[in-house]
Every structure is written in C-alpha cells, then in structure tokens.
Amino acid sequence: MDMSRRQFLKVTGLGILSVAGMSALAGCGSSSKGSGSSSDSKVAAIKERGKLKCGVKKDVVGYGYLDTKTKKYEGLEIDLCYQIAAAVLGVSYEEAVEKELCEFTDVTPKTRGPLIDNDQLDIIAATYTITDERKKSWDFSTPYRTDHVGVLIKKNSGMTKMADLDGKIIGVSQGSTTKDLVLQMLEDEKIDATPEFKEFPDYPSIKSALDAGNVDAFAMDRSTLKTYTTDDCELLQPEIEFGAQEYGVATKKGCDLSKTVDDTVKKLQKDGWLDDEISKWGLL
C-alpha cells in the first residue's frame, strides 16, 4: 500500500525521536568504553567541586569526634579523609588539611548507607564494619583498623560475668551488627543467657539510658565504649574478646572513586602512617 507524504513524515519523525531517546537514555546509564570518562564519574565530580564529601562520626573519640569548643572534627578517620582528599585532588595532605578540602557530615549506622546511595556523600569513614552482606551494596576499602565488641555496665550492677546478662536489657545502635555479635558470642562461649536488646539512634542516647537505668548494659565496639567509660562504669568480662570488627572506607558500589580510596589506604598501611595514627589517637 502506498504511503502518503504526511504519513511518511510522521513515521520517519517517530523513528528519529525513538533513536534519539534511546541514545539519551544510554548516556544516562553509562559512557562509551573507549572514552575513558563518564558523566557519572565520582572522581571528576569531586575535582570539579574541589572538596571531598565525607560521612563521619561526631561522638567517637579517637576516630571521629566534633570538638564543641573549636567546632572542628578530629580523629584517625578525619585524618584519613584528608589523605583521601589529597589523593583525589592531587595535593599534599598538609594542603588538604590547611585548605579544609573535606566537607564533613555526621552519620549514624542507620543513615550512612543511604547518604552514599543518593550521592550526598562521596565516602563514609565512620567505624563502618565490613561484612559480606554490606559488600553487596557498597564498595569497601582494605581494612584500616580492627576492633572488638565489648559490653559496658555499671560497677554497682552486680554483674560479673556474661551469664549475668540473662534477662537483662542491652542497648545497641540502630543499624549496627552488635546484637548479632553478642548473641553469637554467647553461643560460641556456650553461655546460657538470653538478654533483650533495645535499639537507639546514637551512642549518647544509649549511655544516657544506661545512666538512667533504662538499660542494663551498653554493647558496642570497644573503641567506641572507651569514649563513654566513666568512673562508675566498666567492661563486663573484658578478657572475652569477640566480634572482630574490620573498619573500611565505604564508597558507592562500582564507582571509580573506590580504587583511589583503596589504593590510598593500602599506601598508608605500607608506609606506617596508619600505625602512627593509631598511636597518636590512643587506639592501641
């Protein structure tokens, strides 16, 4: 059947629009393999912005802590962020610190993943434990620190051993792996105890609950607990080391920034910088 001129132009026009639309969609998802660049490049975005957006803790002394007097963040993970910023932006560590080439945002175990996913942050350096499950969603660097879980109690609690946790309420942080690790420890040590768990949005809230008697214990990584160990508190059976936590820097899954971050951490391990930092911040 012959096609009129109007019909021909309509069909041809639709075809052109269709091809153009497909090309545009392809550009959103990826770039040409041969181009060596991408509109989705995290490294390029950071260089254009001139700063690295970092998710850190504000309440863990030695790792990520916001000094309320100076209004500045300090700790091993803060220094590590500046090292990564220096590597990405092609400047020295000293220059990165002096020019404040990191933009810090407080994160919690519940918020850190989503902030990476929606590109509000470039990296997370916030005592973020590497697990097989988490590696399905985010990229992690080589571990820069290994810690263990501890259980903080009041000295007058009457508890002297892990078995005394039976029926007690343990405060843990939302989105952390602590609950599972405590239960695994009780099973591994063949300790007959069934505690309850209560989740809190942040560490200060758990400590406040412990002080108020709303929970009987505060379980978390030992380095974190060190921040909250006051004169009237102590670790329950500190000789039981469990729940080894390997901390890594998290980045968006599959992004080009991941390699730079991992290479930087490996270099800092090799040249002894990380060991010096651990000593500097009293994390031995």
Predicted regions mapped to residue ranges:
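N-terminal export signals
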Residues: 9-28
